[in-house]
Amino acid sequence: MANRYLHNVQGLFDTIAPNYDRMNNIISLGTHRHWRKQTMAQIHLASNAHVLDLCCGTGDWTIALAKELQAPGEVIGLDFSAPMLKLAQQKVTQQQVADRVWLRRGNAMHLPFKDNTFDLVTIGFGLRNLPDKAQALTEIYRVLKPGARLVCLETSQPDQPLIKPVWQWYFTKVVPLFGRLFAHQYQEYSYLQETTRHFASYQQLATMFQQAGFQNVHFQRFNFGAAAAHFGTKEAK
């Protein structure tokens, strides 16, 4: 069942890849870049770090991380969508960070890396689309070095009574309409709004981090809780 789900979601992202960046800007009204910038400000990345960016999509966060590094530091961007990775490679070349970026196709729930490999793992707007989120967090914990961190930027759910109905209306009605108007992909963006609406709250995601073994778990909310950055540290030995 999980493999079938993953195959279907992969096909969806293969389909929306050509419009992905433009639609992200439209749906978030450009705020996703601000969220990522604020999240990056809390990472304090060493210039020689080895970083894994999961569900890297078209590579925006991968490139932003690479710009903070110098050799031998590097970022591996992993995604299951070949069309997304093709677009990411074009950006990597344009931004002149190809010496610090390696793009790889793979499954975030079964990472093809040894234990204790990375100084940092990031995942942006990808965790909610995985069929087994707990397995993904367990895998991330495995490949992190002791004392290293996971940083997850993801959509969340506002809990303020005046904000939540507006948020639900926007994702239920407006987002699929944007998909139809700007990308001719109503069904695809109907699915994406469902994963957003039904994903864990920021409190629940913090609990999931703790259940996977992460320590010092904390989060920062954006736009009244429409998105949140979560941080967790692997136990230092």
UniProtKB/Swiss-Prot annotation:
CDD domains (alphabetical): AdoMet_MTases
Xref: SUPFAM superfamilies: S-adenosyl-L-methionine-dependent methyltransferases
Binding site for S-adenosyl-L-methionine: T58, D79, N107, A108
Gene3D superfamilies: Vaccinia Virus protein VP39 (3.40.50.150)
One of the record's GO molecular function terms: demethylmenaquinone methyltransferase activity
Keywords from the named record: Menaquinone biosynthesis, Methyltransferase, S-adenosyl-L-methionine, Transferase
InterPro entries per UniProt: SAM-dependent_MTases_sf, UbiE/COQ5_MeTrFase, UbiE/COQ5_MeTrFase_CS
Top-level taxon of origin: Bacteria
Catalyzed reactions per annotation: a 2-demethylmenaquinol + S-adenosyl-L-methionine = a menaquinol + S-adenosyl-L-homocysteine + H(+)
GO BP, one annotated term: methylation
First-level EC class: transferase
Pathway named in the protein's UniProt entry: Quinol/quinone metabolism; menaquinone biosynthesis; menaquinol from 1,4-dihydroxy-2-naphthoate: step 2/2
EC identifiers of the protein: 2.1.1.163
Family: Belongs to the class I-like SAM-binding methyltransferase superfamily. MenG/UbiE family.
PANTHER family tied to this protein: 2-METHOXY-6-POLYPRENYL-1,4-BENZOQUINOL METHYLASE, MITOCHONDRIAL (PTHR43591:SF24), METHYLTRANSFERASE (PTHR43591)
Stated name of the protein: Demethylmenaquinone methyltransferase
The species this protein was found in: Lactiplantibacillus plantarum (strain ATCC BAA-793 / NCIMB 8826 / WCFS1) (Lactobacillus plantarum)
